Structure formats: C-alpha cells, structure tokens
Amino acid sequence: MNLPPLPARRTLLTTGAAAILTGVTATACSGTSDGSTGPSDASGTSGGTDASPAPPTPSKTAPTGPADFSALAKSLDGSLVRPQDASYPTARQLYNTRFDGLKPAAVAYVRHEADIRECLAFARRTGTPVSIRSGGHSYAGWSSGNGHLVLDVSSLSRVGSGGTIGAGAKLIDVYQGLARNGLTIPGGSCPTVGISGLTLGGGHGVASRAYGLTCDSLTAATLVTADGKTLTVDAENHPDLFWALRGAGNGNFGVVTELTFRTRPVPQTVTAYMSWPWSRARSVVSAWQEWGPAQPDEIWSSAHLAAGPGGGNPTVSVAAFSLGTYGDLQNAVDLLADRIGAPASSVSLRRRSYQESMLVYAGCSGITDAQCHLPGTTPGRTTQGTLQRETYAAASDFYDRSLSPAGVQALLDRTEAFARIPVTASGGGGSIALTALGGAINRVSPQSTAFVHRGSRVLAQYIASWTPGTAGAAQQDWLKNTHAAMRRHASGAAYQNYTNPALTDWRRAYYGSAADRLADLKKRYDPERLFAFPQAL
C-alpha cells in the first residue's frame, strides 16, 4: 500500500526500503528464532553444534521377531519408503544438509492413528528404533537415524477453521489456512517447520510478546502413546501430560497427531528494519537490550550481528514488528535511535497485513504458497517448491539481565572473529541473534507449563553456516567458542527447540525446575523408552 508523505525523522525513513527487510529474512529457517527466523523440528527435537548426531539411546524393548518391512508396508494406508525405492533419497532427507549421511531403515508417511499404532507395534516387536518427524528441522538430526523407522506425520496436515491443526502441517500452510477464515495463532516464521515441533518445544515468534508462545495458545492435543493408546489431553483430561506437552513434548511421550489452538482475529501489522555501520555496533546492542524488552507488548524486536568470512566488515541491524499503529512504532524506533546516538543508515517502516508480514519473514514474499515449500513429491513438499535446504549449526542462551559492557564487547569480538575465517574455509556466515522477551511470555507462571523460561529478558541464538558438502570445521569451532565466551554472561538456560547435543547438563538448561516431574511422567507414559534419543527425558 502507498504510505502518506513522512516528515524528516531521526531514523531517516526511506521509501522503497522494504526489499531490505525481505533480503535480511530470506534465510528464515536458520536465523534468530523459531519465531523470527529459526528452525524447530515438528515432532522430534532440534538444536545442536556437533557435525553429526550422537548415537541414539537404545530402547529397553527386546525384539520378539524379525523386522519384516514388507509386511509392515502392507499393513499401512500410508506409504513406506525403503532404501531401494526411487523416493528414498528425498524421503530420508532432513532440512539441514549436514545430516545427509543418515540412512533410516524406512520412512513411514503415516496417514492416521492406525498407521502409527502399526508402526509402534512393529518397533516394539522387532526392536527397531523409532524417530518422529514432521518438518525435519531437528538441529541435532534426531528426527532420523541410521537403521531407524522414521514416522513422518506430514500427511496429517489438515488446518481446520476452528483452530484444530494436523501435527504435520507446515507453518506456511497453517498461516494461509487460518487466514482464509480471518484467524491466526502466534508462531514461528520458517515456512517449512511443522506446527507440532514448534508448539511442543515452546514456540517463539514475532507475536509472542503480545499473544504468548505458541504452546500458550494450545488448548488440546491428541497423541498415540508408546503402548498404542490414543489420548486426547487438555486441562481436564490427562492434565499432567497436557502440562508436559507444552514445552517438553518433542519426541518424549508419544506421536502427536493433532493440536487445537485458541485462535485470534488476523491483525494489521507494522514492520521495521534498521541498520547501522559496524562502528556503531556497541551503541546499538547496548541501547537495544534496554529498549527491546521494555516496549509495550505489541512491539517485538530483535538485534542481529552478522559476519562473513574473509575480513569484511560485520553488520548490525534491528528488526521490529508491531500489532499497534504505524505512529507508535515510528515513535518507538525514534527513541531507539536517540539512545544509540545516531540515525540508522538504512530504514524500512511499513504497514502490512499479518499474512503479508509472515510471508516476508518467511522469505516467501512474491511467490506462491506452493512455491513456499521444499521441492518434491513426498508429503510435505510440492512439485512447485522453490525453497532450498541449508547447512548450519546453532546454540542458544537466555539472558536474565542486560549484558554488562564486557558482555556486549564479547558479542562484538565473537562476531568479528568470524570475519577472520578465510573465504577458502567452507564459506558460510556467522550470526548472533538477540530476541526481546517479556510481555505475555513472562506473564505465564513458570509452573503452568513445562516451558519454564518465563523470567528472561533476551533469547540469544548463535548460528554458524557453511558450504554444503564441506566439513565446516572453522565455522563450528567459531560456534563452540562463541557459546563458551557468552556462558558467564548468560543464565545457564537454553531453548529446548534449539537442541544442543554439546550440553552436558541439558535437563537443567532446558527444563529447570520441571525436570524431575517430567522424568516421572516419562516413566509413566513410556516405561520401556520406545521414544529414545540422546536427550530424551
């Protein structure tokens, strides 16, 4: 839409700058968070810094018969893809190319709960390890595994007008499906992430400060447990399991098939993007960390530090999203510029529909819904898909307090360190994304759900990417050293949707005070540990 003429402002608003925002978010699946740019698997787990996943924790279930996959295939309504099948090279892929070496025994594209029961019975009977997958965005590769039976729920993708959504629905389809009825839910921005993994691990997004996490809008869930029972859980039925699924549900208690959400009318939005020269980076980070978490609930923001290899200057930018008025966000970013002490060198401020904003953050502005998918013919993909997979690793921290000057300097030093990686060393990029928390997120009691991170000011994600097919050793070393450098400035907690295999005390980092209760529930609902992976409860 055309904007009215604007007076000169301290943020130096420019026309036609929307392309800047689109370009910055074009890699929406390996950016700041599962809300603005971060991936989360859809029914498994996600996160990590190691180049390859740890070996899976074996199930306690003893095999009682041979693994006859041909018989399993005949018992399913959905398709079972084996290594000899033409679709296997695509079926075995996760979103992150660093796990392309994983070779599951079979991928079952389940069509309903009966298919899931057949697969779980087969796994119990034969001792075949199980992985659960929807979006396939697991940072640790734990939605697949060598010799595993992968239960892919992508076919369970119905988006109902009343807010009931199949566990395998991709976020692009969730937003577009709900928008047809004038509705939405708070969620992430990576279009190919599955709704269930986002929700079951919490679910940060650009509307989270206004509406809460994705899991905070969940009102019911249906799942098939390890013994083949179908349970529908909510505040009245199996309330303990309903509590656990909101923050610790990824791959721990069963195969989720359906989620029901409290929906909201689709709002109008305003987006902003501002960048400064790297010489202003200290002032930008120092000012933003006080400004971002203190804004009204309707204003979300993130600060982003990024560098490429080869000695070039890093970049520093701030993105903001508001459910309020254009003028309110304009005034807010002017106050940020005042705190920084310098106008931004480039700015975009624009009114958008909520649906348009989600497409922009997804990197799908200007393309069709069908194109906003991975290409292919297997469930969850489209033949018109134009999105590409990525190669990266990540780690996270929660900051409960503003960073000290030493903490801010550590962020800048680590960003500059990536620029010293030679261009010839697998390329890629390094980034540090800081997302403002507070608002509706922090008004939920830490005891109300299994997502206990309700008192932090900032979620930090450190991301390293490299050229597909290369080792990325220098990039992963940078990531490890960056996470270590920020440890003393952080709370010790980590975001469970950014699963990190390198964490030793992951139970405390992900689940804090909820860890013991969750462990007891795991024993009750999965006593034989059919659902097992290195960081299973």
Predicted regions and their residues:
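Soluble FAD-dependent oxygen oxidases
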Residues: 2-537
